[in-house]
Amino acid sequence: MNTLSRREMLAALGAGALAATLPMRAFAQPGRMQSWPLGTSSRTGIHDVAPAPDGGVWFTAQRSGHLGYFDPRSGKTELIPLGKGSSPHGVIPGPDNAAWITDGGQQAIVRVSWPQREVRPYALPKGTPYANLNTCTLDGDGDVWFTGQSGVTGRVEVKSGKVSVNDAPRGRGPYGICTTPAGDVWYCSLAGSFIARIDRKSGESIVVAPPTPDQGARRVWSDSRGRIWVSEWNSGNLSMHDPKTGKWSAWKPPGTAPRTYAVYVDESDHPWISEWAANAMYRFDPGSEKFERFDFPREQVAIRQIHGRRGEIWLPESGTEHITVIRTA
């Protein structure tokens, strides 16, 4: 592992002196944040969101077993049944305009064509123990890679429909997963406290250990330079690993005991994080190393994942059954 600079080491350890040098900017200006209640007859268990190709937003309804579709133009919500026993966690947009979903209840990766709304499950191989499917991403070849918190990663070869599963290092924990602009696949382990690159030929994981022990890496996202940004649940840090140099950097959001859940990098290479202790969103500027805070008008919103499109940051409020957008343009 590369030697950390004094600044990087202090950041990784979450030193209070460093945190004090990273002040907040003003709260979000009126009009930049807009929220809607989902308006469904019962709780959906909204978990993850993803931009749909027609300007709407998909979300996983983990409690009710649906793919949700929210239309911000009308404010209406549609629920699409995914199958018996469904309990979807993650959703991403595919290059085929379809929604790709990790469905722990069905032990399957599910594709929903759009706008046809045709549902097709890709079941994990027979005999696979319960995987607790979490999140998925598409690699540079158009195949779907996924994580299972029970201790697996896997792939759906989209052209053939073949599904394969690999054991992850250190057992349970695989959670967030992402793809770099070069097409490489990285994931993180919440229980294992590491990130890893997947060898796309063998399916094996190459572990990269962070400098902060037991940091609880929950979500990962790549920026345009292929650097991996990590939300650390246990340490509260926002960290970044540069695969080209092997170096790590880390920053602590404002507050005494932050709980950083999700991370997303927008089109301007600004990382966004959801911070549960503050019930707030933060946008981080890597140049100035400052956090900008965005507050919610509701308590305990519980943002578990972040996604977006140009000029829009979309947020699923698991705690309140709302969906929110922060407009940046």
Where are the regions that the model predicts?
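C-terminal segment of N-terminal export signals and the immediately downstream linker at the start
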Residues: 23-42, 47-50, 77
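N-terminal export signals
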Residues: 2, 8-26
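Blade-level signature of beta-propeller repeat domains, shared across WD40, Kelch, NHL, RCC1
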Residues: 303-329
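Conserved beta-strand positions in repeat-built beta-propeller and related beta-rich domains
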Residues: 59-63, 101-105, 144-150, 187-191, ...
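Short loop/turn segments that connect beta-strands within beta-propeller blades
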Residues: 71-75, 113-117, 157-161, 199-203, ...
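Beta-rich, blade/repeat-based domains predominating
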Residues: 41-53, 84-95, 127-140, 171-182, ...
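A short loop-to-beta-strand structural motif that recurs across blades of beta-propeller domains
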Residues: 66-68, 108-110, 152-154, 194-196, ...
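A short beta-strand motif characteristic of beta-propeller blades
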Residues: 34-38, 78-81, 120-125, 162-167, ...
